[in-house]
UniProtKB/Swiss-Prot annotation:
Name assigned to this protein: Acidic proline-rich protein HP43A
Biased composition (Low complexity): 86-183
Gene designation: H29
Keywords: Repeat, Secreted, Signal
Sequence repeats: 81-100, 101-120, 121-140, 141-160, 161-180
Keyword Repeat (UniProt): yes
Organism of provenance: Mesocricetus auratus
Lineage: Eukaryota, Metazoa, Chordata, Craniata, Vertebrata
Length: 183
């Protein structure tokens, strides 16, 4: 059961990361159409104007392959490439950060609980009510239908039970009494 919940939570989280990257990609495409807006996301290089964009050139030179601004890491890549769908943008998130997200529909609410806390949940239908009882406490439960009434009696007390239909009336007689009555 726990494995199923954890698997579902991980799948939902990966789907959320994928949706986030798609939304960021569409935002960046819209920003690429608006050269006046330059938003820098953490972990990304600032967007560079395209080589065909000659508006705002102060130096009078052709854009060509000459980089504007500081050289970027990687050497060969002088312009940031748009991210591919499905790739995660920005710094990779640590495990602790992912647990602080609000719960997804269908997942359990809040952070995953530990084993000891799960025993304090309200009982599910069909389960016994309350926390599991110990062996000694089970004798004090109310009798189930079809069981004998009251707590189980010990061996010496069984002779005092009321007779069951088909048995002889009264307590079972001792062997010596049977001989005296048969004579």
């Amino acid at each position: 059961m726990l494995v199923v919940l954890l698997t579902a939570a991980l799948l939902a989280e990966h789907a959320t990361i994928y949706e986030d990257s798609i939304s960021q990609l569409s935002e960046e495409e819209q920003q690429g159409q608006d050269p006046g807006q330059l938003h820098q996301r953490p972990g990304q290089f600032p967007p560079q104007p395209s080589a065909s964009d000659e508006e705002g050139d102060d130096d009078g030179e052709e854009d060509g392959n000459a980089p504007e601004g500081p050289p970027q890491q990687g050497g060969d890549h002088q312009k940031p490439r748009p991210p591919k769908p499905g790739n995660q943008q920005g710094p990779p998130q640590q495990e602790g950060q992912q647990q602080n997200r609000p719960p997804k529909p269908g997942n359990q609410e809040g952070p995953p609980q530990q084993e000891g806390q799960q025993q304090n949940r309200p009982p599910k239908p069909g389960n016994q009510e309350g926390p599991p009882q110990q062996e000694g406490q089970q004798q004090n439960r109310p009798p189930k239908p079809g069981n004998q009434e009251g707590p189980p009696q010990q061996e010496g007390q069984q002779q005092n039970r009321p007779p069951k239909p088909g048995n002889q009336e009264g307590p079972p007689q001792q062997g010596s009494e049977e001989q005296s009555t048969s004579l």
